């Protein structure tokens, strides 16, 4: 087989040449507030590290890095819950299905707050070559549906990772939108063997995981990046609305020295008259209707 030299699922188009979409409620800045809720296996290498092993020797269990993640669930999640609760924020939980059993009080709080639940794998681990991906994805979606009473409409792979089959499997399981393909500031249609699904904007540039765990940015840098992004988006509203994703992880954004910057950012966005907060499904429904009206 010849190598694919272009995107096999989302046709290429310049952002400023897309059909004009009517903004939701006349508000061109669409904010998607996301809380990633993950289950890191205790007996496996962690997905990310805050501390390397002494003398470069890594050991299992990796107690400090596992504890870093669990601190987020124990102490960081209450802070994120409070931000959303106090402001009545529409929120999407990108949930490892394994967290339902591993962290039942967190899973129940998400249910009580009526957050949208988006599939995010079973544990925070990409699908292995030796695994039955179709069975694993079905298990994740079924598990969430059983606990929350609603099948997830959206999906983000652990680490945004996929195989060549992932979108086809997700479409066959009824998933409407996929967040792994971070390639535009508005949704696109993605082709699958089972019909089109929505390629939903997410974020890497404004994601607390690469910013803090990889790039070692400061909290002030995080806040300024959002301010600078919105300033650019404002110049583009005449062309089309823009989606601003606030992607958080409790062990990163839920720590005491960062949470205040998140509160400040959200409060400033809430004070704008051109801004609307929406869940992933609300954005998907808006896009379906707006795209149909524009074509």
Predicted regions span which residues?
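Catalytic alpha-helical scaffold of carbohydrate-active enzymes acting on polysaccharides/glycoconjugates
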Residues: 2-198, 223-246, 252-295
């Amino acid at each position: 087989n010849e190598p694919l030299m272009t995107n096999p699922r989302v046709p290429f188009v310049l952002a400023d040449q897309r059909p004009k979409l009517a903004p939701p409620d006349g508000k061109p800045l669409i904010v998607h507030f996301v809380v990633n809720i993950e289950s890191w296996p205790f007996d496996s290498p962690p997905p990310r590290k805050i501390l390397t092993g002494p003398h470069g020797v890594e050991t299992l269990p990796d107690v400090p890095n596992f504890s870093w993640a669990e601190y987020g669930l124990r102490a960081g999640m209450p802070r994120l819950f409070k931000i959303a609760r106090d402001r009545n924020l529409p929120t999407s939980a990108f949930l490892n299905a394994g967290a339902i059993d591993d962290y039942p009080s967190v899973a129940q709080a998400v249910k009580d707050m009526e957050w949208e639940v988006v599939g995010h794998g079973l544990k925070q681990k990409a699908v292995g070559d030796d695994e039955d991906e179709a069975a694993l994805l079905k298990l994740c979606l079924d598990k969430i549906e059983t606990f929350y009473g609603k099948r997830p409409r959206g999906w983000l792979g652990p680490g945004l990772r996929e195989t060549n089959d992932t979108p086809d499997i997700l479409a066959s399981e009824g998933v409407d939108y996929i967040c792994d393909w971070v390639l535009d500031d508005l949704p696109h249609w993605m082709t699958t063997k089972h019909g089109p699904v929505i390629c939903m904007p997410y974020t890497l540039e404004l994601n607390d995981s690469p910013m803090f765990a990889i790039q070692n940015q400061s909290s002030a840098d995080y806040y300024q990046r959002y301010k600078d992004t919105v300033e650019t988006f404002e110049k583009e509203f005449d062309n089309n609305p823009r989606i601003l994703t606030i992607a958080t992880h409790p062990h990163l954004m839920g720590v005491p020295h960062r949470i205040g910057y998140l509160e400040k950012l959200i409060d400033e966005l809430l004070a704008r008259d051109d801004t609307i907060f929406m869940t992933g499904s609300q954005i998907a429904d808006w896009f379906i209707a707006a795209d149909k009206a524009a074509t």
